[in-house]
């Protein structure tokens, strides 16, 4: 494809009237050679309304001797008992890991990935491998797009959403949410927005 484009540019440069100057051709050649490729390892969801987390499976790998997370050795992990839980979490018979690092205080026997960076065991809720203080492990739910809640509070990406009503809270998509009194975007109140009528229009 690059050869075809350069060939066409060279032909245009030779036409009467000089539709393209030789300098333009050289610039185009330089652009064609130096234009960067899209980084296939870049996170395509690096924004507040997208899911910033791994696919449900596939980031952990292992051979006969070691476990790896995205090419980096997971120190101390047991190859024989290791399981990928999804969302960056994994565990062996003794330890829970998040993105290859130990999750302190997590119970291996009851730990589960909830999605969106959240996980929990029978006693504690975690966000990105850190304890989410004050959250009820028994009743905590991940609602999507970074939002989670228990019967007493709402959180967004591990931070409490001040004043949000858990009982009426609803995640709407694309970072938007509402309760009976307010509308939120990425965990922040949208001043003046009406929760009763707020909606995300369909795309045409």
Language-model features, listed with the residues they occupy:
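Positively charged n-region of N-terminal signal peptides that target proteins for export
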Residues: 1-4
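Bacterial N-terminal signal peptides
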Residues: 7-17
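Non-catalytic tandem-repeat scaffold regions and their flanking low-complexity/translocation tails
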Residues: 28-204
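Signal peptide processing junction and immediate N-terminal pro/mature segment
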Residues: 18-29
């Amino acid at each position: 494809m690059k050869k075809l484009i350069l060939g066409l540019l060279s032909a245009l440069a030779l036409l009467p009237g000089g539709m393209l100057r030789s300098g333009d051709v050289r610039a185009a050649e330089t652009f064609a050679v130096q234009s960067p490729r899209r980084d296939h390892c870049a996170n395509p969801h690096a924004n507040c309304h997208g899911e910033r987390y791994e696919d449900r499976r596939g980031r952990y790998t292992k051979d006969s001797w070691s476990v790896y997370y995205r090419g980096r050795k997971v120190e101390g992990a047991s190859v024989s008992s290791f399981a990928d839980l999804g969302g960056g979490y994994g565990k062996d018979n003794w330890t829970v890991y998040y993105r290859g690092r130990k999750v302190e205080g997590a119970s291996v026997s009851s730990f589960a990935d909830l999605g969106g960076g959240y996980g929990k065991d029978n006693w504690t809720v975690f966000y990105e491998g850190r304890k989410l203080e004050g959250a009820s492990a028994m009743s905590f739910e991940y609602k999507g797009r970074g939002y989670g809640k228990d019967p007493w509070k709402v959180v967004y990406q591990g931070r409490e959403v001040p004043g949000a009503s858990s009982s009426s809270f609803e995640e709407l998509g694309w970072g938007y949410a509402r309760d009976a009194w307010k509308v939120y975007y990425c965990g922040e109140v949208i001043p003046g927005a009406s929760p009763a009528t707020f909606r995300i229009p369909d795309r045409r």
